[in-house]
């Protein structure tokens, strides 16, 4: 999609997931 907001949202989600993964380690 070319929706900037959606892109931002996905970026945010990815970041969040990385943090979650770090917590699980």
UniProtKB/Swiss-Prot annotation:
Highest rank taxon of the organism: Eukaryota
Region (Disordered) residue spans: 1-25
The keyword DNA-binding appears for this protein: no
Extra remark beyond the main annotation: Exhibits hypoglycemic activity in RIN-5F cells (in vitro) and in diabetic mice (in vivo). No hemagglutinating activity on rabbit erythrocytes and does not increase IgG and IgE immunoglobulins in rabbit plasma.
Record-given protein name: Insulin mimetic protein
Expression by tissue: Expressed in seed.
Record's comment on post-translational modification: Glycosylated.
Keywords: Glycoprotein
């Amino acid at each position: 999609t070319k929706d900037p907001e959606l892109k931002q949202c996905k970026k945010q989600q990815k970041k969040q997931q990385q943090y979650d993964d770090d917590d699980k380690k």
